[in-house]
From Swiss-Prot:
Matching Gene3D superfamilies: Putative methyltransferase TM0872, insert domain, Vaccinia Virus protein VP39
Subcellular location: Cytoplasm
Keyword set, alphabetical order: Cytoplasm, Methyltransferase, rRNA processing, S-adenosyl-L-methionine, Transferase
Enzyme class: transferase
Substrates-to-products reaction catalysed: cytidine(1402) in 16S rRNA + S-adenosyl-L-methionine = N(4)-methylcytidine(1402) in 16S rRNA + S-adenosyl-L-homocysteine + H(+)
Gene: rsmH
Lineage: Bacteria, Pseudomonadati, Bacteroidota, Flavobacteriia, Flavobacteriales
Species in which this protein is naturally found: Christiangramia forsetii (strain DSM 17595 / CGMCC 1.15422 / KT0803)
Function: Specifically methylates the N4 position of cytidine in position 1402 (C1402) of 16S rRNA.
Name the UniProt record assigns to this protein: Ribosomal RNA small subunit methyltransferase H
Residue stretches spanning the membrane: none
């Protein structure tokens, strides 16, 4: 087994698990198992009759499986949350925790292709069994598709130029590695900010490869169905697109627009937020730089 903290240093560990308000005999779900840090903390707070189900689509995470009779690890994408809980006979749960984004392990494993720091084949699949990889996005997407994803997922003003340059280059030779992609795009980026903007470009490609926005929406809609009244939702986001969806869904049960009012002017929403936005302390950011962009939102099912 890998040392959990080496695989992924859990962010906002105490705060996110506190948000679940764990009942000793409750049923909980950690939808982003990773290195198992959050799951271990939940298990510490569960009694002998409590249950914890965890999801992770990355086979590497299976090496961190916790040997505990109260724990079940499901090697699937959390977009299938309800389906696989029902397979285990679970229809309602007391709390759901999610720590979205890429694990430290995935960033640090060069061959996974998530990081701008290493030269590797363009991949970025969280589930290595999926067909779509960064290679297909970069080499097969139309120019308009590339432009849209750079705009939508990275908010890049020079998205048209980036897309045009990629399409022009691949006519001669396929773009197969991160080093090729970096060398191609760096001259188009603001001097002194090349690495930051490259990271945004990689984020956009990764979101597309793993359908992260669609997956998050599907997951959030299911939480309303599976949480018991009073059950808790504790979710950590790392970029504004994710956080905006989580915030809107908690507030209104919708991803856009406003909920309809009844004839008396009342609105019906599935959740009530618990406290406000929680961000990491300066101390945590110093110890774990990846925590710097984390945002935790907690809600209670009505």
């Amino acid at each position: 087994m890998m040392i959990l903290m080496e695989y992924h240093n859990p962010v906002l560990l105490k705060e996110s698990v506190d948000g679940l308000d764990v009942k000793p005999d409750g049923i909980y779900v950690d939808v982003t198992f990773g290195g198992g840090g959050h799951s271990k903390e939940i298990l510490k707070r569960l009694g002998p009759d409590g249950k914890l189900y965890a999801f992770d689509q990355d086979k590497d995470a299976l090496e961190n499986k916790i040997e505990d009779g109260r724990f079940t690890l499901i090697n699937e994408n959390f977009r299938y949350l309800k389906r696989f809980l029902r397979f285990y006979g679970i229809k309602k749960v007391d709390g759901v925790l999610g720590d979205f984004g890429v694990s430290s392990h995935q960033f640090n494993e060069a061959e996974r292709g998530f990081s701008t720091r290493f030269d590797a084949k363009l991949d970025m699949r969280m589930n290595q069994g999926d067909k779509l990889s960064a290679y297909e996005v970069i080499n097969e997407y139309e120019e308009e598709q590339l432009k849209k994803l750079f705009w939508a997922y990275a908010d890049l003003k020079n998205a048209p130029k980036l897309a045009r340059t990629i399409v022009s280059e691949r006519k001669n030779n396929p773009i197969e590695t991160s080093e090729q992609l970096n060398d191609l795009l760096k001259p188009l980026l603001f001097k002194g900010k090349e690495n930051k903007i490259l990271a945004q470009i990689y984020q956009a490609i990764r979101i597309e490869v793993n359908q992260e926005i669609e997956v998050l929406k599907e997951f959030l809609l299911q939480t309303e169905e599976i949480l018991k009244p009073g059950g808790r939702l504790s979710l950590i986001s790392y970029h504004s697109l994710e956080d905006r969806l989580v915030k809107r869904y908690i507030r209104s049960g919708l991803f856009e627009g406003e909920p309809e009012k009844d004839m008396y002017g009342n609105i019906s929403v599935p959740f009530k937020k618990v406290n406000g936005l929680i961000i990491p302390s300066k101390e945590e950011i110093q110890q774990n730089n990846r925590a710097r962009s984390a945002k935790l939102r907690v809600a209670r099912k009505l």
